[in-house]
Amino acid sequence: MTDTPSNTDPLQSAIAPDFSSVPTQALDALRMKFSQLTASLSKIRDEMSRAELPQWYTLQAQLTVTLSQLSSLTNTLDHYEETLDATVAYPLPSFPTTAHEGLITTLMRKKNIPEVDEWIKDAKETNGLDVDSLSDAEIKKLINKDKDITSWATKCLLDERAKHSYTGLYTTKERQTESIDDRDNLYTSSVSNVKTSRPFSVDKVLKFVNQGESY
């Protein structure tokens, strides 16, 4: 004889989760970026909490890595912006909402924390744009225009820099006493046509800092 099944609550029964609609690629990429950034920030906090402060070059190197990780995280968020905006998170019926009410409230939070609101307000005031009266398309157009102007200014600066030489420490009197041939060699162009290869890529450096793996 078989046992008759007892009446069970369908909400408490085992439910096979369906992950087909979960943006696993975006979430996994963000998880890795957040993990790297969190580890770097924790390291900086620990170093600054010591009685003896670290050397400035050590702190500068760690800060450079942290800024690179922050930039990489920002690019990843921008890349998956549409996917994340269309994603709706919700707890499964089996989640213990009563025991972990604080955790679920934090995870499902929609409103920004006060610090984030201050960052957004400061960014809006700094860029000088009236975001309330402009549409998203107009704001993106202005941002792209600013990027174009920045690229143009950078190119002009590099072109102007290539016209001058900043090598050598000769005074005007010393240059005047030199022969023409020697004077021609005093200031050679500081722009080299030789393309130097980068010994390490940014991804390899960040992976080494985070995981300690050598190559």
Curated annotation (Swiss-Prot):
InterPro entries: Mediatior_Med8_fun/met. The keyword Nucleus applies. Pfam families: Med8 (PF10232). Keywords: Activator, Coiled coil, Nucleus, Transcription, Transcription regulation. GO terms for biological process: regulation of transcription by RNA polymerase II. Transmembrane segments: none annotated. It is found in: Nucleus. GO terms for molecular function: RNA polymerase II cis-regulatory region sequence-specific DNA binding; transcription coregulator activity. Residues 27-89 form a coiled coil. It comes from the Eukaryota. The keyword Secreted does not apply. One of its GO terms (cellular component) is mediator complex. Component of the Mediator complex, a coactivator involved in the regulated transcription of nearly all RNA polymerase II-dependent genes. Mediator functions as a bridge to convey information from gene-specific regulatory proteins to the basal RNA polymerase II transcription machinery. Mediator is recruited to promoters by direct interactions with regulatory proteins and serves as a scaffold for the assembly of a functional preinitiation complex with RNA polymerase II and the general transcription factors. Belongs to the Mediator complex subunit 8 family. Component of the Mediator complex. This is Mediator of RNA polymerase II transcription subunit 8. It comes from Kluyveromyces lactis (strain ATCC 8585 / CBS 2359 / DSM 70799 / NBRC 1267 / NRRL Y-1140 / WM37). The lineage of its organism: Eukaryota, Fungi, Dikarya, Ascomycota, Saccharomycotina.
